[in-house]
């Protein structure tokens, strides 16, 4: 029963942090020091990734009509624009498949230390602050997602590959990359949400396949723990997405940059004390 309660807390953390540019992985690893699940390491490692399925579903629910090319209420032109969004998403996910997939095992084995997580949290926090200072003096060249080219989408996808390093933040890397290319905060944020669907589904599926292929099965209340975490992450992520979409219309990402730096320092302290 205690693990169910811990799964609720971890689901809240995942839901809050998955789409904010502050690294869900960094938060989950930090939480693991404090409220570690009383489960085998193999299950915990799988749980930390697959729990994000709940967060992905929140994107689908919020954007179901916009991302549905078969919606009867849409005109032929609108359906065409929806297909174009999916073509851009496919273009953006290609770098993760071509570059990221072959490196996945190596990254899991060599880049999950607290040193790496704290470093990426701090580095990308600084980058967000620097970018916003630069961005404040210029107007974005891309303010409409429908006008984004497949080439631009592909470049954003290249930035997403960087997020395979724990602590980077998938949303952080893609939003940062999109803004560097010239996207408005809103377009960068929204496209990051869309790109999360195939990327996170793929990552979760890969983790599950590895889990079962290694001979593991769900025992005891493990399935319940996973499902509870996913449901909670869905609810909280839904609220987080709504918040961020409203936030970026009138605010910048500097607070998230500073937050990342502080969190990176906390992870460093925890690593030195508890590792």
Swiss-Prot record:
Gene Ontology cellular component terms for the protein in this record: plasma membrane
Record-annotated membrane-spanning stretches: 2-22, 43-63, 83-103, 111-131, 161-181, 186-206, 225-245, 255-275
Class in the EC hierarchy, top level: hydrolase
Gene Ontology MF annotations: undecaprenyl-diphosphatase activity
Membrane topology: Multi-pass membrane protein
Location of this chain's protein in the cell: Cell membrane
EC id: 3.6.1.27
First-listed, main subcellular location of the protein, grouped into a coarse class: membrane
Catalytic activity from the UniProt record: di-trans,octa-cis-undecaprenyl diphosphate + H2O = di-trans,octa-cis-undecaprenyl phosphate + phosphate + H(+)
Residue ranges that the Swiss-Prot or TrEMBL entry lists as coiled coil: none
A Pfam short name: BacA
InterPro entries in the record: UppP
Protein keywords: Antibiotic resistance, Cell membrane, Cell shape, Cell wall biogenesis/degradation, Hydrolase, Membrane, Peptidoglycan synthesis, Transmembrane, Transmembrane helix
HAMAP family: Undec_diphosphatase
NCBIfam families cross-referenced by the UniProt entry: PRK00281.1-2, PRK00281.1-4, PRK00281.1-5, undec_PP_bacA
PANTHER family, sorted: UNDECAPRENYL-DIPHOSPHATASE
Described function: Catalyzes the dephosphorylation of undecaprenyl diphosphate (UPP). Confers resistance to bacitracin.
Note in the entry: Bacitracin is thought to be involved in the inhibition of peptidoglycan synthesis by sequestering undecaprenyl diphosphate, thereby reducing the pool of lipid carrier available.
Family the entry assigns: Belongs to the UppP family.
Name listed for the protein in its UniProt record: Undecaprenyl-diphosphatase
Name of the coding gene: uppP
């Amino acid at each position: 029963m205690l693990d169910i309660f811990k799964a609720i807390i971890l689901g809240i953390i995942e839901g809050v942090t998955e789409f904010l540019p502050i690294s869900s992985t960094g938060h989950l690893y930090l939480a693991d020091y404090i409220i570690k699940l009383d489960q085998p390491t193999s299950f915990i490692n799988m749980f930390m990734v697959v729990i994000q399925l709940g967060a992905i579903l929140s994107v689908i629910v919020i954007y179901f009509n916009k991302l549905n090319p078969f919606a009867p209420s849409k005109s032929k032109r609108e359906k065409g624009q929806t297909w174009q969004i999916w073509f851009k998403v496919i273009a953006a996910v290609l770098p993760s498949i071509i570059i990221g997939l072959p490196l996945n095992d190596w990254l899991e084995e060599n880049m999950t230390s607290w040193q790496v997580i704290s470093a990426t949290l701090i580095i990308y926090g600084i980058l967000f602050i620097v970018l916003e200072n630069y961005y404040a003096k210029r107007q974005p060249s891309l303010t409409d997602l429908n006008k984004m080219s497949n080439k631009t989408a592909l470049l954003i996808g290249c930035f997403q590959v960087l997020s395979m390093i724990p602590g980077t933040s998938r949303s952080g890397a893609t939003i940062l990359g999109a803004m560097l290319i010239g996207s408005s905060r809103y377009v960068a944020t929204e496209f990051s949400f869309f790109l999360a669907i195939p990327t996170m589904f793929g990552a979760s599926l890969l983790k599950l396949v590895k889990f079962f292929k290694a001979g593991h099965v769900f025992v005891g209340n493990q399935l319940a723990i996973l499902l509870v975490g996913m449901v909670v992450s869905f609810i909280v992520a839904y609220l987080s997405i709504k918040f961020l979409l409203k936030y970026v219309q009138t605010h910048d990402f500097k607070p998230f940059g500073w937050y990342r730096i502080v969190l990176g320092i906390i992870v460093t302290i925890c690593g030195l004390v508890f590792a």
